[in-house]
Amino acid sequence: CIIMASGLGKRFGSNKLMASFHGAPLIHSVLDVTGSVPLFADRLVVTRSREVHDYCQSLGIPVLIHTLPNRNEALCLGLTHMLKRHPDLSGCLFALGDQPLLRPRTLERICRRYLECKISPRHSESVFPDSDFSILKSKLPQNSGIAEKSPIVQLCSVQMTASPEPSVSTTVGSPILFDRAYFDELLHLPEKAGGSHVLRQHPDVVQYVTAEVPEELMDVDTPEELKRLENLVTIE
């Protein structure tokens, strides 16, 4: 698992990843969640921030600090380092450092979906086990219905309404788990591109796992968004 924590926080006005979220730095939520998933062989944080670097070190979490300007370079740096530590890595999940409402069970479901596809590539429509797939399949970007042995698994949220007629809105986002078949593409992304570039090249292998709540996909760009997410946790 690689945690991307290189955002400059320009809209936030300061280092958002170290901003207080229920008494701890914002990034702590993702560190805590990813640390509770036993399916990960290792974790690595990639950041530009000395504060984030020092905080991760204080927790014993592997961290790389860099001054690279572009997303593709930071992603390449992280994946290269992870492959040096684990040359036989079968896949890698990329998470964002500013998604504080991400849940451990959701990460586990992403990993298990990946493993299902690796073991049985014809394992079909359990992507939406609790939803009306007949509606959903017409609304999401579509794969062939058959996961190949080199899957990409992406988190999405689905919101359904019953009136005046059934409808659904979907959002796709992070985390994303890539099979090692796509590592070379991730290591050679176009300038300023991220992992979504690889998704667009292989839409037929992407599998979707639904978030337990839509807010899991929300990241933080402004102090107002941080406050809103804090309030959501308080309500829950």
Predicted regions and their residues:
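Short, structured coil segments at secondary-structure junctions
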Residues: 39, 58-60, 202
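Acidic helix N-cap motif at the loop->helix transition within catalytic regions
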Residues: 51-57
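Conserved donor nucleotide-binding strand/loop of the catalytic core
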Residues: 59-73
